[in-house]
């Protein structure tokens, strides 16, 4: 069997590692570098990947793609994608299914297609080192990636000729890299992962005893549209604004100038991590009727920090949520690990240090740790690494829409995966022959406030009164964090399935917003839940009362029947509104109006069921005696 390689498919840079002699080894690419820029360029006759693509970007900005990971598994109409549409030099378009795609030289391409080019280079790098074909890989994704984004990443692997054996979360991979050699003790580690395009925080417990190691993710949070690219963009916009003030020209309208500006901004940002001031000097950046124009701007570290301060602050809220979800305080964290190139910025390190009250570890390479962890996980899957157990989680709650537009959760956020959950539901109407299973992701009670992941129908339900059919809905999250849903009619055995596909993209900003909304609207959700409960109880009472009126027939006096029908109409009107008190008042009035109906029903039941009731009492008495005897016997034993 060939080697399974570990790939960190990053927004800005990618990295590949493999187990060599029992140790994870980061491999150098054809250019001699241990990391490869996640940049792809298309020319007339070839596809260029990595550093060569980066070098030619200035002369080919419209056909050079970077940060493509920010588009993977996303919808074109997402706010995050729309922001990128306005600043990227290449063309982002809407696919027929609404996904965000890109266009180069008239060719429309899906992000997984473009990402596959990076994976192909990683595959070739590993094959050159190993001297054999590579067909299997473990690929990392941000912990807060949703089902669509995970599925799209697997698709990219398949396009690159790789069977993706496992999708692993980036912070978890970094924890594996850090903890694999820690042979004794129990450590709780916070992994702060600020990469080129995504941010994750994971709280992970590493338990090492007698050679056995368990890596258990306690909680995770993040934002998959926050990273080094956003820091770069702040600096790019600042430089463009300064140039416009001085020269009156807007560089944003010139793709060639913007590509040069991007390179200069990235270089300046890196330099300011080790120096207090740098100069961006771009001669002949553009020209007008008066001649060529040059851009010369001095930037201090303090200026850069002021430009990105709010971005750094944005990373702190997920830290608080993750700690709360793990039921831990800052003092419970033993070690803090920094992952991702953007964590080299001193201001980021300072913010993390201040939050946790301790210095982050310096012995983890922020650019390579994730790939190393992926290679270790590959070793676990191939059997080369033993006595290591990895327990990851799903970042958001999953459920279905039920009666009253309520989201009923089947799997809560931060549940260890793989996992399964099932629950039995029923029909809302008499003789209902089909049900729609609407799959949702989020934390809100109101279905419409969550994200729709997909829906499907279960047909062929046999006619029956509402509430009688039993429809079992099963959620199954695999080890990659990808969701599979099935619905089965327990009587007929008829079954329907759905796997969440990339076309149902859910942006992580939406995910983060759902969690924030759930916290901010906890009281609102509670009131909505109570309203729906009252509405459902009222509907159920009307349904039952109608049946009892029919069964009572002529035994029900006309006056009482008229009162009951009027009360039922009042309830039906009330349930169409959103006034819980009005619904409950109308429900109580229906109960009171139905007093005569209850008397008739009880009298009828007593007449028809006397014999059965007597038998039941006898049976219960016997059963009670048996229980009492056992109970007494136990008590005697204790004495």
From Swiss-Prot:
Phosphothreonine: residues bearing it: 198
InterPro entries, per database record: ATPase_NBD, Chaperone_DnaK, Heat_shock_70_CS, HSP70_C_sf, HSP70_peptide-bd_sf, Hsp_70_fam
Stimuli inducing this protein: By stress conditions e.g. heat shock.
Composition bias, Acidic residues: 625-639
Signal peptide residue numbers: none
Function: Acts as a chaperone.
Similarity-based family: Belongs to the heat shock protein 70 family.
Entry protein name: Chaperone protein DnaK
Organism: Shewanella sp. (strain ANA-3)
Gene label: dnaK
């Amino acid at each position: 069997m060939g080697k399974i390689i570990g790939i960190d498919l990053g927004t800005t840079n990618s990295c590949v590692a493999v187990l060599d002699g029992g140790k994870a080894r980061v491999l150098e690419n054809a250019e001699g570098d241990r990391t490869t820029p996640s940049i792809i360029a298309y020319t007339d006759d070839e596809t260029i990947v990595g550093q060569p693509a980066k070098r030619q970007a200035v002369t080919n900005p419209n056909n050079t793609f970077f940060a493509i990971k920010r588009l993977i598994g996303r919808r074109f109409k997402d706010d995050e994608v729309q922001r990128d549409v306005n600043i990227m030099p290449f063309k982002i378009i809407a696919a027929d299914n609404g996904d965000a795609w890109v266009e180069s030289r008239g060719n429309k391409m899906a992000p997984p297609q473009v990402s596959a080019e990076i994976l192909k280079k990683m595959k070739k790098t590993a094959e050159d080192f190993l001297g054999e074909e590579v067909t299997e890989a473990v690929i990392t994704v941000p912990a807060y990636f949703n089902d669509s984004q995970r599925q799209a990443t697997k698709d990219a692997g398949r396009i690159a000729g790789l069977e993706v054996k496992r999708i692993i979360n980036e912070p978890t991979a970094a924890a594996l890299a850090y903890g694999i050699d820690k042979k004794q003790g129990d450590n709780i580690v916070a992994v702060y992962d600020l990469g080129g395009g995504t941010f994750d925080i994971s709280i992970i417990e590493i338990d090492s005893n007698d050679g056995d190691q368990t890596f258990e993710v306690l909680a995770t949070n993040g934002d998959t549209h926050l990273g080094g690219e956003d820091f770069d963009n702040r600096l790019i916009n600042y430089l463009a604004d300064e140039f416009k003030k001085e020269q009156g020209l807007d560089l944003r309208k010139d793709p060639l100038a913007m590509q040069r500006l991007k390179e200069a901004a990235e270089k300046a940002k890196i330099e300011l991590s080790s120096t207090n001031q740098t100069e961006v000097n771009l001669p002949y950046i553009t020209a007008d009727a008066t001649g060529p124009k040059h851009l010369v701007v001095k930037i201090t570290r303090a200026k850069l920090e002021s430009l990105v301060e709010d971005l750094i602050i944005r990373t702190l809220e997920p830290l608080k949520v993750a700690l709360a979800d793990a039921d831990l305080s800052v003092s419970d964290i033993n070690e803090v690990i920094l992952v991702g190139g953007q964590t080299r910025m001193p201001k980021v390190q300072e913010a993390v240090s201040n939050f946790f009250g301790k210095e982050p570890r310096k012995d983890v390479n922020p650019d390579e740790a994730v790939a190393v962890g992926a290679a270790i996980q590959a070793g676990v899957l191939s059997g080369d690494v033993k006595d290591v157990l990895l327990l990851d989680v799903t970042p958001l709650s999953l459920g279905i829409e039920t009666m009253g537009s309520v989201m009923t959760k089947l799997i809560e956020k931060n549940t260890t995966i793989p996992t399964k959950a099932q629950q039995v539901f029923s029909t809302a109407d008499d003789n209902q022959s089909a049900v729609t299973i609407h799959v949702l992701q989020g934390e809100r009670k109101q279905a419409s406030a969550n994200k729709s992941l997909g829906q499907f129908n279960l047909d062929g339900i046999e006619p029956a009164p509402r509430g009688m059919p039993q429809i079992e809905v099963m959620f199954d999250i695999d080890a990659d964090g990808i969701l599979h849903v099935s619905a089965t009619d327990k009587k007929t055995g008829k079954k329907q399935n759905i796997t969440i596909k990339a076309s149902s993209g859910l942006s992580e900003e939406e995910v983060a917003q759902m969690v924030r909304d759930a916290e901010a609207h906890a009281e609102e959700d509670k009131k909505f839940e109570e309203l729906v409960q009252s509405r459902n109880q009222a509907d159920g009472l009307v349904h039952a009362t109608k049946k009892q009126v029919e069964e009572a027939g002529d035994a029900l006096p006309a006056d009482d029947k008229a009162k009951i029908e009027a009360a039922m109409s009042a309830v039906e009107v009330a349930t169409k509104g959103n006034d819980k008190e009005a619904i409950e008042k109308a429900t109580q009035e229906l109960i009171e109006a139905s007093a005569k109906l209850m008397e008739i029903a009880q009298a009828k039941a007593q007449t028809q069921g006397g014999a059965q009731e007597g038998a039941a009492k006898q049976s219960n008495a016997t059963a009670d005696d048996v229980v009492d005897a056992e109970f007494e016997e136990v008590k005697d034993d204790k004495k």
